[in-house]
Amino acid sequence: MSEKQVALYIAVSLDGYIADENGSVEWLESIDSEGDAGYEAFFDNVDTVVMGRTTYQQIFSLTDTFPYSKKDVYVFSNTKAGTKDEYANFVAGTVDTWLNNIDGEKIWLVGGAKLVQQFLKEKAIDRFVITIAPIVLGNGIPLFEEDREHALELEEVTRFGQFAQLTYKNLEEN
Protein backbone atom coordinates (compact mmCIF):
# COMPACT_ATOMS: atom_id res chain seq x y z
CA MET A 1 0.00 0.00 0.00
CA SER A 2 1.30 3.45 -0.83
CA GLU A 3 1.45 6.24 1.69
CA LYS A 4 -1.70 8.25 2.39
CA GLN A 5 -1.58 11.87 1.22
CA VAL A 6 -3.82 14.53 2.74
CA ALA A 7 -4.34 17.79 0.87
CA LEU A 8 -6.10 20.84 2.24
CA TYR A 9 -7.68 22.40 -0.86
CA ILE A 10 -9.54 25.55 0.13
CA ALA A 11 -10.31 29.15 -0.79
CA VAL A 12 -9.63 32.06 1.56
CA SER A 13 -10.09 35.80 1.52
CA LEU A 14 -6.95 37.91 1.29
CA ASP A 15 -7.12 38.38 5.07
CA GLY A 16 -7.32 34.63 5.71
CA TYR A 17 -11.01 33.88 6.24
CA ILE A 18 -12.73 30.80 4.79
CA ALA A 19 -16.22 32.11 5.51
CA ASP A 20 -17.85 35.32 6.66
CA GLU A 21 -19.02 35.82 10.24
CA ASN A 22 -22.27 33.97 9.42
CA GLY A 23 -20.42 30.98 7.99
CA SER A 24 -21.35 31.87 4.41
CA VAL A 25 -19.03 31.49 1.42
CA GLU A 26 -21.31 33.34 -1.00
CA TRP A 27 -18.68 36.08 -1.33
CA LEU A 28 -16.66 33.67 -3.49
CA GLU A 29 -19.35 33.65 -6.18
CA SER A 30 -19.11 37.41 -6.74
CA ILE A 31 -15.50 37.24 -7.96
CA ASP A 32 -14.57 36.58 -11.58
CA SER A 33 -12.47 33.46 -11.97
CA GLU A 34 -10.86 31.72 -14.87
CA GLY A 35 -12.44 28.28 -15.22
CA ASP A 36 -12.71 26.18 -12.10
CA ALA A 37 -9.34 27.19 -10.60
CA GLY A 38 -8.01 23.67 -11.09
CA TYR A 39 -10.78 22.09 -9.03
CA GLU A 40 -11.78 19.36 -11.49
CA ALA A 41 -8.20 18.14 -11.97
CA PHE A 42 -7.68 18.13 -8.20
CA PHE A 43 -11.00 16.40 -7.50
CA ASP A 44 -10.38 13.70 -10.11
CA ASN A 45 -7.16 12.80 -8.28
CA VAL A 46 -8.68 12.16 -4.83
CA ASP A 47 -10.45 9.03 -3.64
CA THR A 48 -11.56 10.21 -0.21
CA VAL A 49 -13.18 13.41 1.05
CA VAL A 50 -13.24 14.45 4.71
CA MET A 51 -14.92 17.41 6.36
CA GLY A 52 -16.49 18.64 9.58
CA ARG A 53 -20.20 18.41 10.31
CA THR A 54 -20.91 22.12 9.80
CA THR A 55 -19.24 22.07 6.39
CA TYR A 56 -21.21 18.95 5.47
CA GLN A 57 -24.50 20.59 6.42
CA GLN A 58 -23.61 23.76 4.53
CA ILE A 59 -23.12 21.81 1.29
CA PHE A 60 -26.84 20.99 1.23
CA SER A 61 -27.74 24.69 1.48
CA LEU A 62 -25.53 25.47 -1.53
CA THR A 63 -26.60 22.76 -3.98
CA ASP A 64 -29.39 20.30 -4.68
CA THR A 65 -26.98 17.58 -5.76
CA PHE A 66 -24.34 16.23 -3.38
CA PRO A 67 -21.09 16.92 -5.28
CA TYR A 68 -18.94 14.17 -3.74
CA SER A 69 -21.14 11.10 -4.22
CA LYS A 70 -18.51 9.25 -6.28
CA LYS A 71 -15.91 9.47 -3.49
CA ASP A 72 -15.63 7.92 -0.04
CA VAL A 73 -16.92 10.67 2.25
CA TYR A 74 -16.21 10.98 5.97
CA VAL A 75 -17.63 13.60 8.30
CA PHE A 76 -16.09 14.23 11.71
CA SER A 77 -18.96 14.63 14.19
CA ASN A 78 -19.05 13.88 17.90
CA THR A 79 -22.84 13.63 17.91
CA LYS A 80 -23.30 11.32 14.91
CA ALA A 81 -20.11 9.23 15.09
CA GLY A 82 -20.55 5.60 14.13
CA THR A 83 -23.54 6.29 11.88
CA LYS A 84 -23.87 6.91 8.17
CA ASP A 85 -26.36 8.48 5.83
CA GLU A 86 -26.90 8.33 2.08
CA TYR A 87 -23.66 10.20 1.36
CA ALA A 88 -21.23 9.96 4.28
CA ASN A 89 -19.80 7.97 7.15
CA PHE A 90 -19.74 9.90 10.42
CA VAL A 91 -16.61 9.48 12.53
CA ALA A 92 -14.97 10.87 15.66
CA GLY A 93 -11.68 10.47 17.48
CA THR A 94 -8.16 11.33 16.44
CA VAL A 95 -7.17 12.07 12.88
CA ASP A 96 -4.33 9.55 13.11
CA THR A 97 -6.66 6.73 14.14
CA TRP A 98 -9.09 7.62 11.36
CA LEU A 99 -6.32 7.73 8.75
CA ASN A 100 -5.09 4.30 9.86
CA ASN A 101 -8.59 2.83 9.52
CA ILE A 102 -9.54 4.00 6.03
CA ASP A 103 -8.63 2.53 2.67
CA GLY A 104 -8.30 5.85 0.84
CA GLU A 105 -4.86 7.10 -0.12
CA LYS A 106 -5.48 10.50 -1.74
CA ILE A 107 -7.53 12.47 0.73
CA TRP A 108 -9.07 15.92 0.36
CA LEU A 109 -9.55 17.82 3.61
CA VAL A 110 -12.45 20.10 2.65
CA GLY A 111 -12.72 21.93 5.99
CA GLY A 112 -14.01 23.50 8.15
CA ALA A 113 -11.70 25.45 10.36
CA LYS A 114 -12.05 23.24 13.45
CA LEU A 115 -11.19 20.09 11.54
CA VAL A 116 -8.27 21.84 9.82
CA GLN A 117 -6.92 22.70 13.31
CA GLN A 118 -7.24 19.06 14.36
CA PHE A 119 -5.34 17.87 11.28
CA LEU A 120 -2.67 20.56 11.86
CA LYS A 121 -2.18 19.54 15.49
CA GLU A 122 -1.62 15.95 14.40
CA LYS A 123 0.67 17.06 11.53
CA ALA A 124 -1.60 15.21 9.11
CA ILE A 125 -1.70 17.67 6.20
CA ASP A 126 0.86 16.89 3.50
CA ARG A 127 -0.05 19.58 0.99
CA PHE A 128 -1.78 22.94 1.29
CA VAL A 129 -3.54 24.20 -1.85
CA ILE A 130 -4.76 27.64 -0.85
CA THR A 131 -6.67 29.74 -3.37
CA ILE A 132 -6.68 33.40 -2.36
CA ALA A 133 -9.69 35.47 -3.36
CA PRO A 134 -9.21 39.21 -3.99
CA ILE A 135 -11.46 40.33 -1.17
CA VAL A 136 -10.89 41.49 2.41
CA LEU A 137 -13.73 40.31 4.64
CA GLY A 138 -12.54 42.05 7.81
CA ASN A 139 -13.86 39.27 10.01
CA GLY A 140 -15.27 35.79 9.79
CA ILE A 141 -14.03 32.24 10.28
CA PRO A 142 -10.23 32.17 9.97
CA LEU A 143 -8.50 29.29 8.22
CA PHE A 144 -5.76 29.10 10.84
CA GLU A 145 -6.34 29.79 14.53
CA GLU A 146 -3.48 27.87 16.05
CA ASP A 147 -0.49 29.91 17.15
CA ARG A 148 2.10 27.19 16.49
CA GLU A 149 4.41 27.57 13.49
CA HIS A 150 4.34 25.11 10.59
CA ALA A 151 7.25 24.89 8.18
CA LEU A 152 6.07 24.84 4.56
CA GLU A 153 7.77 24.93 1.18
CA LEU A 154 6.20 26.75 -1.77
CA GLU A 155 5.80 24.36 -4.70
CA GLU A 156 3.66 26.29 -7.15
CA VAL A 157 1.85 29.58 -7.77
CA THR A 158 -0.97 29.66 -10.32
CA ARG A 159 -3.25 32.50 -11.38
CA PHE A 160 -6.90 31.81 -12.17
CA GLY A 161 -8.43 35.12 -13.23
CA GLN A 162 -8.50 37.23 -10.08
CA PHE A 163 -7.56 34.28 -7.84
CA ALA A 164 -4.02 33.26 -6.84
CA GLN A 165 -3.49 29.62 -5.94
CA LEU A 166 -0.52 28.75 -3.75
CA THR A 167 0.55 25.14 -3.29
CA TYR A 168 2.76 24.32 -0.32
CA LYS A 169 4.37 21.11 0.85
CA ASN A 170 4.35 20.51 4.61
CA LEU A 171 7.94 20.08 5.81
CA GLU A 172 6.90 18.68 9.19
CA GLU A 173 6.54 14.95 9.55
CA ASN A 174 3.81 13.20 11.49
Question: Residue ranges of each PLM-predicted region?
Answer:
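Enzymes that bind and transform nitrogen-containing heteroaromatic metabolites
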Residues: 1-174
